[in-house]
């Protein structure tokens, strides 16, 4: 077991009850272009086209064999584009249950499949996009091979679902998915302390337990300790529900689009786990579930998720949470003179530090305006990786990609710096800054 000591479990109220219920049915689903870094789409459909579940909506110009397939059957109702015609989302109004069939195999033959058979089925079905590389967090090139594949079966994000609850319902499919992934590379199955999961004793699968505060459950943490990456070495990672989907694909020949997500947050009337579907319309999913007022829906974690609004009002491809917060649009009178009983800080600046175990109803307010970056040891307190966070963040801010690489930027994804953004006195958002630097590093070779 690997136990980390540095990090932070955000004391936010509204944690979900770890029991799965059926969610409100949604009428539309979507693929979000923002989820796929560096992807340039070649569209295969247009508005008004009827599509089947698993039918290609677009492919990647750089890797034409990688298909991005429909998460539901119905009619393409909208293709949203932003500045410079960047793809925002492809929306499907659900209608019917037509679906494409893919290759299927008996469960006892999965361990004998070739890597080519596995790749072909994942590519044709669109489940290849469940995989992401590290460095760069992109859908991998089908011609590349990873040093290893990381399966994240632990989740320490605030308000997250317990993976063990979900996997318990789909044990056979999860084990089948691990077997299939083992045909591509060695697999690291990362889990919580004291948890036993299906398939962890399979040949080619190494189970590794992690413990400690967030980010103990992030793939970046697991990769750093088990198989670090660099300019000449890459690994792939995916979450536990995509492993289940892969197992279902290879044993049934059909896409499994069900997702169990946490519907939680301080403004949720009944925080719980809900059974919905990939790319679900979050406005419809949250209807009638929130306290009255001006609330914000976030696809993903409160630390590193994306505001779900307009063209982006759908569950992200890699997200397993719908987090809901009150909009922090009210200024507090003489807030700097208050004791801070209802505010949280990593530093000893509020009385709330004396109230151990207290949960806070966080809002979207940053509690201050942008200012200079001030290193007071807060980054080091939440960074468990063996890097120099203050120095790295400084070089990321000024855009010195050479020094950023030397200090470990290639090991990181936006979510790995989310806690640094939270504790930053200067109110910097380090995730987008990191992404800009990674894009430049990749372009410059």
From Swiss-Prot:
MF-aspect GO terms: oxidoreductase activity, acting on NAD(P)H, quinone or similar compound as acceptor
Classification via InterPro entries: NqrA, NQRA_2nd, NqrA_C_domain, NQRA_N
Quaternary structure and partners: Composed of six subunits; NqrA, NqrB, NqrC, NqrD, NqrE and NqrF.
Pfam families on file: NQRA_2nd, NQRA_N, NQRA_SLBB
HAMAP family: NqrA (MF_00425)
Protein name: Na(+)-translocating NADH-quinone reductase subunit A
Ion transport listed as a keyword: yes
Keywords of the record: Ion transport, NAD, Sodium, Sodium transport, Translocase, Transport, Ubiquinone
